[in-house]
Amino acid sequence: MSTNSTPRKQKLSNSKSLQNSPISPTVKKTNSFPLGNNIPTNINRSKKDKNNNSNNNINNNNSNGIGSNTIINSTPIATTPVPPLPFIHSSSSSSSSPSPSSSSSSPFPKAKKSPSLSINQQQQQQPQQPQQSPQSQQSPQSQQSQQSQQQQPQQPQEQQEPLPNLSFLRNQEPDKNVLPTSRKRPPSVMPSTPNQSSNSSSLNSSLNFSSSNSSPSPTSTQSNNSRFETRSQNDQYENNNNNNNNNNNNNNNNNNNNNNNNNIECIVIDDDDDDDDDEGNSIKSTHTSTQSTPIRDRRQRDNKWTINPLPQFQREIIDVDTPSPPNESLSIVSQTTTNTITDTTSIQTPTLIRQSSSLLSSSSSLSPSTTSTPLTQNNINLQNAQVIATMTAPMEIELPTIVQLEPLFSSEFTTSTQNLFIQTPPFTSTLTLPTTTAQTSQTLFTIQTSHDINNNNNNNNNNKNKNKNKKEIEKEKEKLREALKQKLKEYENENEKEREKERKREREIEIERERKERERKEREKERKKEKEREREREERERKEIERKEREREEREERERKEIERKETERKEIERKEIERKEIERKERERKERKEREEREEREREERERKEREEREKEIEMEREKKKEKEKEKEKEKEKEKEKEKEKEKEKEKEKEKEKKRKENEVENEIEKERREKNDSYMVLNYHHSIDDHHSESESESDSDQDSIYSISTQELSSVISDNDFCDSDNEKVANNNRTVGETFLNDSRNNNNNNNNNKNNNNKKIENDKNQLIERERLISAFNDKAFLYALDTIREVLGGIDFKLKVSKEQIIEISTNAKKPLNILSEPEQQQQQQQQQQQQQHQQQQQQQQQQQQQQQQQTTKTTTTTNNTTTTTAETEKPKEVFLLKKPIKIPYGRDCKKRLIRRFHGTSRNPLFHKNLESTLKLLKRAKFDWASIEFDTKSYLMNCNCKTVCHKSERMKDNPTNKLQNNNRNNNNNNNNIINNNNNNNNKNNNNKNNNNKNNNRNNNSIAKKIGTNNNNNNTTIIKNNNNNNNNNNNNNNNNNNIIKNNNNNNKNNNNNNNTIVKKIETIKKDINKKPTKTTTTTSSSSSSTSSSNSLTVIKKPVKKINGSQRICLFEDDFDVGIGVPVTTGTSETTTTRASSIRRKMNISNIFDDFTKKPRQNKYNEIEMPDLFASKECNYTLEQQAPFIRAQKLLLTQQHENNLYNGKRFMKYDEWLDLYHGEMRSSIQNPKVLKHYISFSQEVYGEAEPTLLRHWIHLGLIKPTDVFCDIGCGIGNVLFQLAAQVGCRVIGVEIRKDLYDISQSMLEIYKKRSLELGLHPSTQQIKIYNCDVKGSLEFDFSEPNVFFMHNTCFGPELEISIMELFKKYSKPGTKVITMKTLCPRFKPSDKKTKPWGIFKYPYESYEMEEGSLSWRSATNCSFYSFTIDDKDSDIVTDQTHLNRVILSTPKKKHSKLQLFSSSSLPSSPPSSSSSSSPPNIATNTTTTTTTTTTTSPSSISLPSPYLSPSKKTPNSNKRDRSDIDNSNSDDGDENNNNININNNNNNSNNKPIKLKLSMDHSIDNQSNSESSDTDVEYMPWSKRNNRKKRKSLSYSLDSYLSSRISPSLSLSTSSSSSSSLDSSPYSSPPSSSSSDNENDDDNGDDEDDSSSSNDTKLKEKLLLMKNNEKIGGAPPLTRRNANSDTNKLVQGCYQSLSSYALPKEESQIHKLQLQAKLLEHKNSLVLKHQKSIHDQQKRLSRKQKKLAKKNKKKEQQLQAQAKTINYNNNNNNNNQNDNQVNHNNLNENEINTDLINGYNNNNNNNIINNDNDNDNDNDKDDDKDSNNKDYNNINDNNK
């Protein structure tokens, strides 16, 4: 049978059955190897390596040698195991006519793309197999015949039988142990074309490949990943049984002639990697014989299996049926173990096999446990021509036909049968090489030579054909058919998979085509859209052109209208200008007429004035002549007096030495008692380390009492300012103090020696001054202890900022007081205990001595003569009572809040409503001081006495706090002394001279005791000393006011004396209910020696103590602050141990205090629980928030002022824009000029670039509140488009500056600025409206303008970050001036503590700040309902100690500028009254320049007359009945010459001030807490008034009293002083004023009504101007705002406002804190005005009763008074002095009344009832009935003038 095979690449199938396919191998010999023991072949697989491929592959050339045309024959041997055979399936059949080209060379495609055999081809193969003989399946002769038939196509072929039935190969069941094949596509083996040029058919040999793994490892297997795929050149083959023998014979003959050696090459296509499938190269497979292991080489790219070359062999036919002899055959045994194939396994030597039936019938599964034995040389038999070839060199086997191999090298795969179908070109028959059964253990392969092939084949075929049966052949055919069917199914499956892949590829192509189509369509759509856009662009351009054309037309129309409007406005302006000129002409004429009238009036007045002056000059000439005569007489008298005084001085010096010694003993005892009981002064025990010198200081304390050196708090302030109050080391403090103590002791000894040695007074003064200067420097060095200084300053602030004085003596005693009265012991605690024990012992001894001294003094008073006593009093008072220096702080020291103790103290006050201004619970504050770093000092303080004597006039006067009060002790002592004095007076009623002597003695004792007290009470706190002085002043005034009564008692009337004592006792009993525990020991009070104290010789031993008036730059000032207010309680003064004192009952009444009134009203004791009278929480609110309702009255008044200013501006040619005009301009032109309004909203949310506008309504609100004025420089930080700047510039005319960070908004503002300038020029606005500058910069960066210029800033800081706000506040602190305002939409002060002034950035602002509620629609971004804007004021940066004296004076004198509800202008002691003079009542007031001459200095004061606005002061209609004489009162603490100066001043004043006339003034008081006008704010007081008093509200607004020129000059310009219209005002330069004239209460009320009528009759224009003037003054002053807090409806909220303002004293400068204190006092008193009104009636009735009694006494004693004056002339030659003293007593009598007036004025009793009470007091105290008083007063003063002459 001839076969034509075409090479095609087919896929490998995973079949489990063994199939044989025909191949035509040619064995190519490359090298010859000697025969050896181990002759296996190794398989090397090379992958992707062409170099290795070239090295390993051998050229396919024909070569001469042994083994050409070999045929594989296998012989089973039962003794050896069968090696695994390859599953080789026939995939193609031979064609009818083979050609050399087809057999020699044919290209092979890729293994993946090579299809399997088709179904038709397989059907053609099936009928050939059953035609074989039963003995053998196919013989070699048949194969040769088939090959010859193929080579001869001309021969007609017979009908071919179908392929033999291969079903027997599939019938057997597979072994259960066999595993399925791998799913991975096995490699495909493609045959390479042999290089054979011969036309002869090649050998057809059957190969049995028994191969192991390709890896070098003996245990690894990779055979299941590879397949041998053999393909024939033709797709079909045919078997012809009839011609088998012939064909075989022919083929054998042909083969015998062909002795060429052929190479057999097996090409294996491996599909392990994907790269192999992509490439179309076939893979050669060579089996090598090295190490008997087939190595699979992966280095070759073409994936060829290279079979190592076969050894040279001799051809010999071996009969399969009979075993060959051992010397004639070569057996190659394949040995394998389980799951492995040993290294010796290889493709064994191929032999020609003669198939037998036994082999065909025998089929078994391939066992993997077969073993192979290597070839040996002993098995070769060369003699019998049966040469067994031994592989000696590598050899390639080329397979021209397609061979399909199943994976056989894996131990996982076994089959029942393994047949090798080989179809070669020279043979026509198919040889089947079945595998042996499991029992066969060895297979013998022999190689036969080619010349024996034909003979052996014929013999074998004949023998086999005979033995075979037809049944067996049919069975085999059936088996073959079944196998082919199964194979066909597999091929169909493979074809289906290939078709599926092709379908997938088609789908992919289709998808790609669709994608391209879709892209094409999209491109088309894009082109269409582009065309549409082009059309739209053209349309838009066309519309834009149309729009511009339309806008141009509109612009032209608008310009035309604008021209018309301008023309109409021009005409209107011209019309208004004509009208304005007409009005101006009329106004000018009216003014000229008025000026002409005024000029005539002035000329007339000038003529009258000249005439009057001429008359006055003549009178003055006469007076001067009289004075010169009197002076000459006085000089003669003075010379006589001086001679007598020199004689008396020597006697008195000896007495003074004894007195000093006794006084020192008394003082030491008193000091010890003071320390034990802590009476009304602060003790600060400083622990110095002076133990070594303490004994010396105690021993010398008695003799050196005068060496006391003082330092002022002004000097202390300089020390404190140099020190930073940081903690100092204890050792340094101790060393400093030790050295200071030593220096003081040494210097004190030297000073004492000098004082003893120097006898002259002048030398003493010089030495003392030097020593004082030295000791002051040392004291300053001693105060280097910073903690001590800090403690002193802290105590000073706790006490309300009272000025005090420090002194240091040689005993290391430091005195802290206002007048240096009581020293402080600087001793340790054990030393203090010793002193206390000594004091107790000395106290008992002292009491005994005092009793003895009292008896002695009583005897001396009876025996001494009047002449000597009077002289002694004048001398002793001049010498012993020397004035002491008082160093006052012009401005209290201000220390930064840097220490923990101070912080804790202030925090305690703030948190618990315990403000030091109200002196509540001071004990707790002192405990805090003890705890806070003051371990070295013990601070003790008598808080109860301080609360009794404090000046706050609030709740602190409680009955429970009045224990252990020194003033109470004074009263008890005075009561006892009154009893003693009464006894003395009663015993001496008959002797007038003796009475006068008693008076003089009492004056001596008083002066002496006062001097001693002045030395001892040096450490009293300021407040205590001042209060004691005030009480003494009151007592002296009381005593002086009782001159008439006391004179009557002394001379004639014991009954009157008893009545006065009874009155005193009744009033004292009332005071005793409040004051207890007084009667233990006498207390010393401070006195200020003055002319009043020396003049008490004629007033029955009554000491007159006046409060010192503080000095500033040598000029006296009014006590304006609360520390200077007089307590005003009438307490009698101790004048010694046995002096007589009497007091007037009416003067000892209790002060109208809120707490006292409340006690009397409720008739219950005061409780410590909270009530409405006590202070509420200070932190009820954080700021002063003003509602729209509270702003309304102020805005109404401001509108009137603005309208008036607008009219004035128009009158002066200044035109500003109105609000309506601005709205038209802004919304009509400026706003519409913004092309793209959406630009305003292009910002980042919640950033500093957020844009929000302030609407014009908000700016109008600012203007109405007066926050922005034409003189201001306004700066808007974040101005946006500049709408705020334009409006303020247009309406106010101020200079404006804008800062904007956004460039787009800045550009819009510049365009709007151009529009604004054009429009303003058209309207004719003032040039000040053009001062607009806008900068595009960042505030945090570099500024383009001067930041210090603006004084009003605005920040719309709703979205400003904290960093930006802090940086802006730092700029304020660095550049802005004090008083600069900052308006914000969000508060810059989140919280406030006093320490924030120095530590926080918002400390630059004053506190509390203000917030104002906004109108609705004030902001663009919200409705602004219930929203507020904030107003901050930058505080003074230099808020520390101010040493500029002129600045302080200016502040003190300008404090009353603040219009307030209660004008607290002067204290009670600063306005004493003077007795009337004898001049006529009709004469106008005069000004007489008065020179007060003294022995040492001469001071002159110029007259002052001030004309002030009428709302505050206006002259009353009623003129006083008689002129009264002023009396001077010199402050002893500020003078250096004592009583001598005072005496001279009294004489001059008595002579010069006789014709002065007082001026009646009226103060208009405002009750408004809101600081508004009287008409608007008086409604708040109606609630507290009785219904009967509401109609008299106008009466309560005015108070009539008189002022002198000095006080009027100290009052602020808001007060007006005016005189009668017919005469000019002239006042005396005396510092005291005259009291009002004597009149009844009814007449006084009538006068008040008349004044109110005059006020109401004034024109409306003047009232309006007055109201506006008040508001304007309010703005200039600053301080508290002019409006009230929000919801200030209840009384407690009003108090909260006042308390909160007082709290600012911790944060504000001292000047402003004083203003707040004044405001607080007034508001508290206003709040309690209702209680005062209810209690007034009872007080008024009591005063009436007292006044009636005094009137009766005055009528009875008129004659007796005249007798006393006559007796005084005969008793002493100094009658003038005595008479002056009597007049002074009467002045004091009036002085108390005036004090009551002033205290009532300060306390706020400014209603009509108060006026009535005061006027009644004045009438009751000074005068009798309306008719009798005039005569009596005139007679009295006429008598006095006669005596003076």
From Swiss-Prot:
| Protein's UniProt name | Histone-lysine N-methyltransferase, H3 lysine-79 specific
InterPro entries, A to Z: DOT1_dom (IPR025789), H3-K79_meTrfase (IPR030445), SAM-dependent_MTases_sf (IPR029063)
Is DNA damage set as a keyword in this record? Answer: yes
Family from the record: Belongs to the class I-like SAM-binding methyltransferase superfamily. DOT1 family.
- Enzyme Commission code: 2.1.1.360
Q: Which organism is it from?
A: Dictyostelium discoideum
Where is there biased composition of kind Basic and acidic residues? 295-304, 585-679, 1069-1080
The biological process GO terms on file are: DNA damage checkpoint signaling; DNA repair; methylation; regulation of sorocarp development; subtelomeric heterochromatin formation
